[in-house]
Amino acid sequence: MRCDVVVVGAGPGGSMAAKTAAEKGLKVVLVEKRQEIGDPVRCAEGVSKARLSSMIKPDPKWIASEVKGARLYAPDGSNVVMSEDKSGDEVGYVLERKIFDRALAMDAARAGARVMVKTRALDLLRANGSVKGIRAMRYGEIIDIEADVVIGADGVESKVGRWAGIDTALKPGDIEVCAQFLLYDKGIDDEYCEFFLGNELAPGGYVWSFPKGEHLANVGLGVIGSRSEPGAPVKLLRRFVERRMPEARIVEMVVGGVPVSGPIERTIADGVMLVGDAARQSDPITGGGILNAMQAGMIAGEVVADAVSSGDTGVEGLMAYEKRWRESIGKQIARHLDLKEFFIRLSDDDLNKLMHSIQSEDVSKMDLRGMLRVLIRLNPKMLWELRHLVM
């Protein structure tokens, strides 16, 4: 089989890359190792309304609910409320990822991409030292898919990057180990996402609740890998639910890992590009990665079209991708990495003090940067080293 570009992984980033490249006239193959795209769901499913709408038209079929904003809780229960449009990239719509991911893959197919499920990439094909496609297993048969460029959108455990010689290694402190329940509870607030901080609740991470309507919610937590033990996230999550939602009924459970390392040093090689979690483009504070992956996927699709058209699919031909995604989303990722590294060092007493300090402030219309500016003003001794983030 021969094509211009093969995309490995049909998550949001991979599907957007495939769709964009196909719209530019390339012959595209999108492969997915699972037989059902979007399943299992491994995230809280929240996205910003404005940012999502800037990339695709929202469709009620894949929107589970809309929220008014977010509540952020300190360990002692004190909290602040932020409006939806100021709460970051994970608050606004709560998606049905199983439907959403398939819809994005269908959009890629409508644009002209060939979508191949139950197709697992096994290795890269090489010719004269250059990457020229992938070898894959499909329905028990080994197949070769020749291509000028391989886009690796194969998630946190990306093999494409490793095969291409890109260092994608993660240290324990670079990953949040997560567990999540889809549960029913009459006490779920269907209008607000909720975030709970505290080292007793989730060491180096936080607990989240994303309402999906009719008192269903994704309730989960992440624990920084360097402070986790086998099975700890599930145990901690069960304890949280038992204490806060004793009448809850668990419908589904998923576990996984999210990179919070900040971007890897390079996301391209000769004939190879990495997108989304494979490139460590998720937000280091929240772990959210849907929108960053989609934006990076669109950039990758545009750049690969130019590279194939020019006949230069080596590092120089793909360098525009590296530059464009770092300029558009990389700066915020870098700022949030600094914040993450600082806040995971704080004690619960520190977190309580910070929350108490802004109780009298109207933060409902502040974004994260604005809130941080106020916190630094009110707590200069504790937060002075973060002042460069709000300059």
Swiss-Prot record:
Reactions catalysed according to its record: a 2,3-bis-O-phytanyl-sn-glycerol 1-phospholipid + 8 oxidized 2[4Fe-4S]-[ferredoxin] = a 2,3-bis-O-(geranylgeranyl)-sn-glycerol 1-phospholipid + 8 reduced 2[4Fe-4S]-[ferredoxin] + 16 H(+); 2,3-bis-O-(phytanyl)-sn-glycerol 1-phosphate + 8 oxidized 2[4Fe-4S]-[ferredoxin] = 2,3-bis-O-(geranylgeranyl)-sn-glycerol 1-phosphate + 8 reduced 2[4Fe-4S]-[ferredoxin] + 16 H(+); a 2,3-bis-O-phytanyl-sn-glycerol 1-phospholipid + 8 A = a 2,3-bis-O-(geranylgeranyl)-sn-glycerol 1-phospholipid + 8 AH2; CDP-2,3-bis-O-(geranylgeranyl)-sn-glycerol + 8 AH2 = CDP-2,3-bis-O-(phytanyl)-sn-glycerol + 8 A
Primary enzyme class: oxidoreductase
Gene3D superfamilies for this protein: D-Amino Acid Oxidase, subunit A, domain 2 (3.30.9.10), FAD/NAD(P)-binding domain (3.50.50.60)
Keywords, sorted A to Z: FAD, Flavoprotein, Lipid biosynthesis, Lipid metabolism, Oxidoreductase, Phospholipid biosynthesis, Phospholipid metabolism
Entry's EC annotation: 1.3.7.11
Pfam families reported for this sequence: FAD_binding_3 (PF01494), GGR_cat (PF22578)
InterPro entries membership: DGGGPL_reductase, FAD-bd, FAD/NAD-bd_sf, Geranylgeranyl_Rdtase_fam, Geranylgeranyl_reductase, GGR_cat
Functional pathway: Membrane lipid metabolism; glycerophospholipid metabolism
GO biological process: glycerophospholipid biosynthetic process; membrane lipid biosynthetic process
Signal peptide, first to last residue: none
Keyword Flavoprotein among UniProt keywords: yes
Cofactor(s) the protein needs: FAD
A GO MF term: geranylgeranyl reductase activity
Positions annotated to bind FAD: 13, 32, 43-44, 46, 97, 121, 277, 289-290
Function text: Is involved in the reduction of 2,3-digeranylgeranylglycerophospholipids (unsaturated archaeols) into 2,3-diphytanylglycerophospholipids (saturated archaeols) in the biosynthesis of archaeal membrane lipids. Catalyzes the formation of archaetidic acid (2,3-di-O-phytanyl-sn-glyceryl phosphate) from 2,3-di-O-geranylgeranylglyceryl phosphate (DGGGP) via the hydrogenation of each double bond of the isoprenoid chains.
More about this protein: Reduction reaction proceeds via syn addition of hydrogen for double bonds.
Protein name: Digeranylgeranylglycerophospholipid reductase
Organism name: Methanothrix thermoacetophila (strain DSM 6194 / JCM 14653 / NBRC 101360 / PT)
Organism taxonomic ancestry: Archaea, Methanobacteriati, Methanobacteriota, Stenosarchaea group, Methanomicrobia
